[in-house]
């Protein structure tokens, strides 16, 4: 998908702000208490997702995340299909005080390619 320059600049800034983690570390992190957060729309989540992941679509994230994940110390692994929405979500969560919000580098596509 071709993105507008302004959107891509925002996504690049988000990737610089939030840590991107390797897809190969996702399962171990989940086993150690991290939450995989699928920020894609529910129809995308229904088709394929990381097993055990929580689904909060990007458009509702900031409105409901505190009810779903009240602990600001929780490691949260945001993901979309690739990078941008995951990184934007992780950066937004960091702004909200979630100190361990990260994104899965390469998103679900990279995770499934393992």
Locate each region found by the language model:
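Rhodanese-like catalytic fold shared by cysteine-dependent sulfurtransferases
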Residues: 1-35, 42-75, 81-114
